From Swiss-Prot:
GO terms for molecular function: amine-lyase activity; pyridoxal 5'-phosphate synthase (glutamine hydrolysing) activity. The keyword Transcription regulation does not apply. The lineage of its organism: Archaea, Thermoproteota, Thermoprotei, Thermoproteales, Thermoproteaceae. In the presence of PdxT, forms a dodecamer of heterodimers. It comes from Pyrobaculum aerophilum (strain ATCC 51768 / DSM 7523 / JCM 9630 / CIP 104966 / NBRC 100827 / IM2). Belongs to the PdxS/SNZ family. Catalyzes the formation of pyridoxal 5'-phosphate from ribose 5-phosphate (RBP), glyceraldehyde 3-phosphate (G3P) and ammonia. The ammonia is provided by the PdxT subunit. Can also use ribulose 5-phosphate and dihydroxyacetone phosphate as substrates, resulting from enzyme-catalyzed isomerization of RBP and G3P, respectively. This is Pyridoxal 5'-phosphate synthase subunit PdxS. D-ribose 5-phosphate binds at D64, G193, G254, G275, S276. PANTHER family: PYRIDOXAL 5'-PHOSPHATE SYNTHASE SUBUNIT SNZ1-RELATED. The gene is pdxS. Pathway: Cofactor biosynthesis; pyridoxal 5'-phosphate biosynthesis. It comes from the Archaea.
């Protein structure tokens, strides 16, 4: 499987990307159109581009939003992207019924009003929701267990699309299966809509614990694991060699405070998704800024202290103890 050779190369690609964005904004201010040949000749859909784009989001926060106002708050707070939904995961859990892709009109409105990347969720196995999002022009598609799956046994073949996909995973086999299907980015599933980061912690420790075990083993151990997971040997071998997943890996599921975000970064996340934790809180602007600060500077305790002081526990979303949920109420078990 072809992947970008090194994360140093991805860092340079990210720097180039931001320079191009600055140039684009300067040209817009001067009333000059963006040179057409650059957009026409872009290598859309290649593995290098699809894996490279998420790498530009490292140390960043992608926030769930349901409208333009929330998207603008996220952008002002420093989010590296927004994820457009019809309902926030907390509300999806409360509402029940069938959760589907957000309205295309809302997605287009958000795209028209912010300059950061715009993502949206599709139901597991729903090819046509993904086709529609690709046609609309989103930057990233999340094949998400938060929405009601249309196929309990099969995920989307993501190699068919030019848009990069992100998928959730609870353990290493699940993550590698999604990558073998073409996922350009992995996130922990956690337990969305609970404001409880415990499951995300469990999933990250499971994934990286298994990788550490593989890295300490021999080739036969890698082959056995590949057979067990039903994924290519080369993918498992690459993961063992890198001692991490070969794609960008974000934390998601229950992140509600700056300390939660810093914890997940400390456990090895490249960045975080925040779902209900911001816009189901009483202080969304301050909390968004604080989580962005803590994520970007997780390895500087003084800055994380500063970020944590920006919010109050009294303003946090009301969390749900996962131990009180019935098995059929768990979202993380959707997908295989």
């Amino acid at each position: 499987m072809s992947v970008v050779g090194s994360f140093e190369q991805l860092e340079r690609l990210r720097d180039l990307f931001y320079k191009l964005l600055d140039l684009r904004d300067t040209l817009r201010e001067r009333g000059v159109a963006w040179p057409k040949p650059l957009s026409e000749e872009a290598a859309l859909g290649t593995v290098r581009v699809k894996v490279g784009f998420p790498a530009m989001l490292k140390r960043g926060v992608i926030m769930d939003v349901t409208n333009v106002e929330q998207a603008q708050i996220a952008e002002d707070a420093g989010a590296v992207g927004v994820m457009v939904l019809d309902k926030l995961p907390y509300d999806v859990r409360r509402a029940g019924g069938v959760a589907r892709m957000a309205d295309l009109k809302v997605i287009e409105e958000v795209m028209a009003h912010v300059t950061i990347p715009v993502s949206a969720k599709v139901r597991i196995g729903h090819y046509y929701e993904a086709f529609l999002l690709e046609q609309v022009g989103v930057d990233l598609i999340d094949e998400s267990e938060v929405l009601t799956p249309v196929d309990e046994q099969h995920h989307i073949n993501k190699w068919m699309f030019t848009v990069p996909f992100v998928n959730g995973a609870r353990e290493l086999c699940e993550a590698l299966r999604r990558i073998s299907e073409g996922a350009s980015m992995i996130r922990s599933k956690g337990e969305a809509g609970t404001g409880n980061v415990a499951e995300a912690v469990k999933h990250f420790k499971s994934i990286y614990g298994a990788i550490k075990s593989l890295a300490a083993g021999d080739e036969e151990r890698v082959r056995d694991f590949a057979r067990q997971c039903q994924v290519p040997f080369e993918l498992v071998a690459l993961t063992a060699k890198l001692q991490r997943l070969p794609v960008i890996t974000f934390a998601a599921g229950g992140i509600a405070t700056p300390a939660d975000a810093a914890l997940m970064m400390w456990l090895g996340a490249d960045g975080v998704f925040v779902g209900s934790g911001i816009f189901k809180s009483q202080d969304p602007r301050e909390r968004a800024e604080a989580i962005v600060l803590a994520t970007a500077h997780w390895d500087d305790p003084e800055t994380v202290v500063e970020a944590q002081k920006m919010v109050s526990e009294r303003g946090a979303m009301m969390g749900i103890d996962i131990r009180t949920l019935k098995p059929e109420e768990l979202l993380q078990t959707r997908g295989v």
